[in-house]
UniProtKB/Swiss-Prot annotation:
Entry annotated with the keyword Nucleotide-binding: yes
Keyword annotations from UniProtKB, A to Z: Allosteric enzyme, Lyase, Nucleotide-binding, Pyridoxal phosphate
CDD domains: Thr-dehyd
GO BP terms, alphabetized: isoleucine biosynthetic process; L-serine catabolic process; L-threonine catabolic process to propionate
Quaternary data: In the native structure, TdcB is in a dimeric form, whereas in the TdcB-AMP complex, it exists in a tetrameric form (dimer of dimers).
Mechanisms controlling activity: Each protein molecule can bind up to four molecules of AMP, which act as an allosteric activator to the enzyme.
Cofactor: pyridoxal 5'-phosphate
Gene name tied to this protein: tdcB
Residues with the N6-(pyridoxal phosphate)lysine modification: 64
Designated name of the protein: L-threonine dehydratase catabolic TdcB
Length: 346
């Protein structure tokens, strides 16, 4: 592969070379996740070939392990000795914690007070020190930055970092290895590290691949920034897609997204829940809200058919770290809707 004129615009931030280097760097740590075809989404919904990239089966249950391990691998011995710190709603936290454990590095993770219990416990289980601070990610991040400065620790940013983006971009290389003629790729978006990395990998190979970012209607800072062509804050309420609850995207990720992503789709909380239910019932996949965003976009009918019908489509299931109480609530809600529908129809 060679970098083309499209990706040259963002090569100073993250390049195909960075991603290929990341692939070699993290190979001993990560799992190459499967890509499976969804017969229901293919035959019943899109009339195309829809594949699910299962990053919920990655170590730590999320794609975040890729970026975290690549970043930490590139730290100096002095930085590793002083310890690392990160701010995360949970998935990045686990990626940092596990990598730190494997490399024998002290790790501190600051999480929002609303972080799911499952993600808190998993992070602690990998040996990291967990501090709960802040009602949203931005408050958490500010506190984390204070601690880092006070203690001389190196920050492992969850998305706005070249090495993190490159690590996430290895997913794009795996997609191309499995489906070289992919037409459309649908990616969940929070701070933008995942879609920036994947878009760089894919567009370096074929600029005509259509890349769609998906965010929740309640929190969509990147989509707002994309269409206003300037960094913009947006958060109306919390979202079941807590892994993407980032109201202000990264400066670096935004620059990549601005040039390489083609469009954004916004989905409601109900549409996200429906997608989680559908993935459980039809594909036997348990996913967190963020991981269901691409499927929600497909099921919602908001994506133009020309990007789906007769096309090879990949929808990324980015993670599966969800509390069982949340899963049971989603199932119960779905059953209640079904019962109500039966009552109306019957």
């Amino acid at each position: 592969m060679t970098t083309n004129t499209v990706t040259l615009q963002t090569a100073h931030i993250v390049s195909l070379g960075d991603i290929e280097e990341a692939k070699a760097s993290i190979k001993p740590f990560i799992r190459r996740t499967p890509l499976i075809k969804s017969m229901y989404l293919s035959q019943n919904i899109t009339k195309g070939n829809v594949y699910l990239k299962l990053e919920n089966m990655q170590f730590t249950g999320s794609f975040k392990f890729r970026g975290a391990s690549n970043k930490i691998n590139h730290l100096s011995d002095e930085q590793k000795a002083k310890g690392i710190i990160g701010a995360s709603a949970g998935n990045h936290a686990q990626g940092v914690a596990l990598t730190a454990k494997l490399l024998g590095i002290d790790a501190t993770i600051v999480m929002p007070e609303t972080a799911p219990i499952a993600k808190q416990n998993a992070t602690k289980g990998y040996g990291a020190k967990v501090i709960l601070k802040g009602k949203n990610f931005n408050e958490t991040r500010l506190y984390m930055e204070e601690l880092a400065k006070e203690n001389g620790m190196t920050i492992v940013h969850p998305y706005d970092d070249k090495f993190v983006m490159a690590g996430q971009g290895t997913i794009g290389l795996e997609i191309l290895d499995d489906i070289w003629n992919v037409n459309t790729v649908i990616v969940p978006v929070g701070g933008g590290g995942l879609i920036a990395g994947i878009a760089t990998a894919l567009k370096s190979f074929n600029p005509s691949i259509h890349i769609i970012g998906v965010q929740a209607e309640n929190v969509h800072g990147m989509a707002e920034s994309f269409y206003k062509r300037a960094l913009t804050e947006h958060r109306e309420d919390s979202t079941i897609a807590d892994g993407c609850d980032v109201k202000v995207p990264g400066e670096k990720t935004y620059e990549v997204v601005k040039h390489l992503v083609d469009e954004f789709i916004l989905v409601s909380e109900e549409e996200i829940e429906h997608a989680m239910q559908d993935l459980m019932q039809r594909a036997k996949i348990i996913t967190e809200g963020a991981g269901a965003l691409p499927t929600a976009a497909i099921l919602s009918g908001k994506i133009d058919k020309k990007w789906l019908e007769g096309k090879n489509v990949v929808a990324l299931v980015s993670g599966g770290n969800v509390d069982l109480t949340r899963v049971s609530g989603v199932i119960e809600h779905g059953l209640n809707i079904a019962d109500t529908s039966k009552g109306v129809v019957g």
